[in-house]
UniProtKB/Swiss-Prot annotation:
Originating species: Sinapis alba (White mustard)
Catalytic residues identified in the record: 125
The organism's place on the tree of life at top rank: Eukaryota
This protein's name: Myrosinase MB2
Subunit structure: Homodimer.
Length: 243
């Protein structure tokens, strides 16, 4: 509620979540009747970003309430590993806490449908970074990114069919590299490859070619689950071994 509820409750009900009002108290401003009427139902669609799932555990607040941040008030500590040192899902690069949990996108979409009345949703970002230490061959083969997008699209397709979630679009993050918060250019992104030492060396990665086939297949054939499942086969592992 201190994350999505902070803005979703006002957008749908014209007020902050009950638990926020209880914990934050007078430090949380109230909506006037006019403000509540103005903001409730004022959105056209929701743009949701999903990358990964984290564990949460209670976190005491040692500071006076007037010095609390939103995270302090939430009273939780988000972690990559549980008490047994386990990640929620498969690990790509443990030194960078790089893992994925594709079923999480199913739960998130179902949660938004159930709690907020099945709003119109676009997945505005979904993707993963890969280690900057990979070789050129590994970057172009890009089997990790294929597995990531494929597995998430499988669960996204599943929740649309099973739960009737109103998702109308999906944007793979990202087309090329970007400067990542806290990591700079030490990790790589993108469906396309660019050699920073030779900008004429540019190639569409295997992940980009795969995404092209997926998009084209989706437009021509509404039944795409078989394509998604077949993409999670040993073919990607063969590409990895070839490098």
């Amino acid at each position: 509620e201190f994350f999505h509820g902070w803005y979703m409750e006002p957008l749908t009900k014209g007020r902050y979540p009950d638990i926020m009002r209880q914990i934050v108290g007078t430090r949380l401003p109230n909506f006037t009747e006019d403000e509540a009427e103005l903001v409730a139902g004022s959105y056209d669609f929701l743009g949701l970003n999903y990358y990964v799932t984290q564990y949460a555990k209670p976190k005491p607040n040692p500071y006076p309430s007037e010095k609390h941040t939103a995270m302090d008030d939430a009273g939780v500590d988000l972690t990559f590993k549980n008490s047994r040192g386990e990640y929620p899902g498969p690990v790509f690069a443990e030194d960078a806490n790089s893992y994925y949990y594709p079923k999480g996108i199913y739960y998130v979409m179902d949660y938004f449908k159930t709690k907020y009345g099945n709003p119109l949703i676009y997945i505005t970002e979904n993707g993963i970074s890969t280690p900057g230490s990979e070789s050129r061959c590994e970057r172009i083969a890009d089997y990790k990114r294929i597995n990531y997008h494929c597995s998430h699209l499988c669960f996204l397709s599943k929740v649309i069919k099973e739960k009737g979630v109103n998702v109308r679009g999906y944007f793979a993050w990202a087309l090329g590299d970007n400067y990542e918060f806290g990591k700079g250019f030490t990790v790589r992104f993108g469906l396309s490859y660019v050699n920073w030492d030779d900008l004429n060396d540019r190639n569409l990665k295997e992940s980009g070619k795969w995404y092209q086939r997926f998009i084209n297949g989706t437009a021509k054939n509404p039944v795409k689950q078989n394509f998604l499942r077949s993409s999670l086969s040993s073919q990607n592992q063969k590409k990895r071994l070839a490098c």
